Swiss-Prot record:
It comes from Geotalea uraniireducens (strain Rf4) (Geobacter uraniireducens). The gene is coaD. Signal peptide: none annotated. This is Phosphopantetheine adenylyltransferase. Keywords: ATP-binding, Coenzyme A biosynthesis, Cytoplasm, Magnesium, Nucleotide-binding, Nucleotidyltransferase, Transferase. The keyword Cytoplasm applies.
Length: 162
């Protein structure tokens, strides 16, 4: 039986406990989850791609079933090149659904070889986003419980706090 691979794409700027929750739950369904960090020049990122990859790898530790990679261009092309058949997307609220639905339908119109699997975020993370974490952190607000300690430390360094 072939191994089932899924791709979990995003900017992960920075990775949060919400992202980690989706990755861990994805690993219960798939043999391998590829965390694919988007090289998106249109987004104004706090962490560069290499920093985001390093944080994700450190957070995931030595889990051999979770891979970290980058991609640019069409997501479905990347998914096919990886030999994966599923894109995992996390949904926090109804407001996420319409945008994610449109992306899934567009991907489906490009290729029917790739499915999109929506995973509802766990309740404690239903409001959580990287943008909220960055904003609260930039104002020296508490982000404990939102990101792992090493991510908090990296955010403190970005905002010149030690």
């Amino acid at each position: 039986m072939p191994l089932k691979k899924a791709v979990y794409p995003g900017s992960f700027d920075p990775i949060t406990y919400g992202h980690i929750d989706i990755i861990e739950r994805g690993l219960k369904v798939f043999d391998t989850v590829i965390v694919a960090v988007a090289r998106n020049s249109e987004k104004n990122s706090l962490f560069n791609v290499e920093e985001r990859i390093a944080l994700i790898r450190e957070v995931l530790g030595d889990n051999s079933r979770a891979k970290v990679d980058t991609f640019d261009g069409l997501l479905v092309d990347y998914v096919r090149k990886q030999g994966a058949t599923v894109i995992i997307r996390g949904l926090r609220a109804v407001s996420d659904f319409e945008y994610e639905f449109q992306l899934a339908q567009m991907n489906r119109s490009i290729t029917q070889e790739v499915e999109t699997l929506f995973m509802m975020t766990s309740v404690p993370y239903s409001y959580l986003s990287s943008s909220i974490v960055k904003e609260v952190s930039s104002l020296n607000g508490p982000i404990d419980g939102l990101v792992p300690p090493l991510v908090k430390k990296a955010l403190d360094a970005k905002f010149n706090r030690s």
